[in-house]
Amino acid sequence: MDLSPRNRPLLDSSSLDSGSLTSLDSSVFCSEGEGEPLALGDCLTVNVGGSRFVLSQQALSCFPHTRLGKLAVVVASYRRLGALAAAPSPLELCDDANPVDNEYFFDRSSQAFRYVLHYYRTGRLHVMEQLCALSFLQEIQYWGIDELSIDSCCRDRYFRRKELSETLDFKKDTDDQESQHESEQDFSQGPCPTVRQKLWDILEKPGSSTAARIFGVISIIFVAVSIVNMALMSAELSWLNLQLLEILEYVCISWFTGEFILRFLCVKDRCHFLRKVPNIIDLLAILPFYITLLVESLSGSHTTQELENVGRLVQVLRLLRALRMLKLGRHSTGLRSLGMTITQCYEEVGLLLLFLSVGISIFSTIEYFAEQSIPDTTFTSVPCAWWWATTSMTTVGYGDIRPDTTTGKIVAFMCILSGILVLALPIAIINDRFSACYFTLKLKEAAVRQREALKKLTKNIATDSYISVNLRDIYARSIMEMLRLKGRERASTRSSGGDDFWF
């Protein structure tokens, strides 16, 4: 499309509302200057996305670091010196120009430009409510306005949304790379490609078939039984059959081992497989059992002292069996969202620990010196006071160490109050991040189910077999599920004070 001035349709003042910001008869800058209106030659017309704005060059020159400020300087230089001016060409700052009518064209959003226009009028930049933070950032960067110029009333909302958008974009890119890597699993190389493909779908895609769903349920049952069995083995009750519990432990470990080996044999890139967090958790869940068997089998010919050391090692290894609980993360969106939230909020968590450490150090020292002179006091040292300050600031309050003096109780009250305030600071950020991660995973699961259904439909069409999948139903279900998730996300944000507070 030719955008040259001779072929571009120009809007005259009759086609615009005389009271609007885009009217040529009522310029926002060509008003009164020193008692008289500015001449038309002192103004320039800016056409942004088809909307025309008449701006004062003098007012634009007050913002020389912006694109329009630079354009005003260039236009003024060309008027004085003509083509011999040392300034750059106006076409370096705009998409097209009509020097005859002094009109300059920009292929940008006219809606976003109204906020830029308000910045030139008042020196205050406000954020669009209808536009995402990253898109608004692109617009103001194009016009040469720094995001630090955003007014204080919109600054918190803008940076909060920008951080959330950047986090979700980074997570989306990571998930896309993971999905691409998984989709590129080449099962054609190696033995039994069809069997490996079907087995991989059963192991890694619980919603792909009835067999996959049954396998997922059985896996969850084995995890739950293993955890309960581990707890019963430590109870040492007289009515429990320890031999039966040991047999049950062997059965659960055999299931976990077979599940891990099948996953390992199905994949092509086994180094990448071993680096993934879910597979590391699976490996840590079964290794302590085999290491314990190995240690116990090799401890027969050792001395008593060595046997005691081996016993301690075995006890530590048995504690690692609690990691089996993390295997539920394969089947729980909430657990995966919790892991993502902790990973993404490490700065907030670190800041929380720093605040707690400072408070514990201060209040424990004060409390120790306030209580040390009391007979039979429980504050025997500063480390003991650390334990008291920790339980008090986290509002646990075991009661094993407590103050007896009035001064100590006042300090305890201040410690508890400061703990409540410190713990409440990052909760809103972590809650928003958890909600965003949860609904992102839900949308991803919906997209995966839709993709699997489309693959099944494509395969049926290619083999001329009976088509049991309706494409329209797949699309309708996916859209309805996404709308439902988006509605829940908005309701969650509103209930946590998100949009209602910021808007």
Swiss-Prot record:
State which tissues express it. Detected in brain, in neocortex, olfactory tubercle, hippocampus, dentate gyrus, piriform cortex and amygdala. Detected in Purkinje cells and granular cells of the cerebellum, in hippocampal CA4 neurons and neocortex pyramidal cells.
- Provide this UniProt record's keywords sorted from A to Z: Cell membrane, Ion channel, Ion transport, Membrane, Potassium, Potassium channel, Potassium transport, Transmembrane, Transmembrane helix, Transport, Voltage-gated channel
Q: Name one GO molecular function term.
A: potassium channel regulator activity
The family database entries (InterPro entries) matched by this protein are listed as: BTB/POZ_dom, Ion_trans_dom, K_chnl_volt-dep_Kv, K_chnl_volt-dep_Kv8.1, SKP1/BTB/POZ_sf, T1-type_BTB, VG_K_chnl, Volt_channel_dom_sf
Q: How does it sit in the membrane?
A: Multi-pass membrane protein
Compositional bias (Low complexity): 10-20
Q: Where is this motif: Selectivity filter?
A: 395-400
Transmembrane feature ranges: 214-234, 242-262, 280-300, 313-334, 349-369, 410-430
Q: Which of the residues are on side Extracellular?
A: 235-241, 301-312
Output a single Gene Ontology CC term carried by this record.
membrane
Cytoplasmic compartment: which residues?
3-213, 263-279, 335-348, 431-503
Q: Specify residue ranges for compositional bias: Basic and acidic residues.
A: 171-184
The segments labelled Disordered in the record are 1-20, 171-192
Would you kindly state one Gene Ontology biological process term found in this protein's UniProt entry? protein homooligomerization
The yes or no answer to whether the keyword Transmembrane is present is: yes
Spell out the subcellular localization from the entry.
Cell membrane
Q: How does it assemble?
A: Heteromultimer with KCNB1 and KCNB2. Interacts with KCNC4 and KCND1.
Q: What does this protein do?
A: Potassium channel subunit that does not form functional channels by itself. Modulates KCNB1 and KCNB2 channel activity by shifting the threshold for inactivation to more negative values and by slowing the rate of inactivation. Can down-regulate the channel activity of KCNB1, KCNB2, KCNC4 and KCND1, possibly by trapping them in intracellular membranes.
According to its record, what is known about the domains?
A: The segment S4 is probably the voltage-sensor and is characterized by a series of positively charged amino acids at every third position.
Family (UniProt): Belongs to the potassium channel family. V (TC 1.A.1.2) subfamily. Kv8.1/KCNV1 sub-subfamily.
**Name used for this protein in its record:** Potassium voltage-gated channel subfamily V member 1
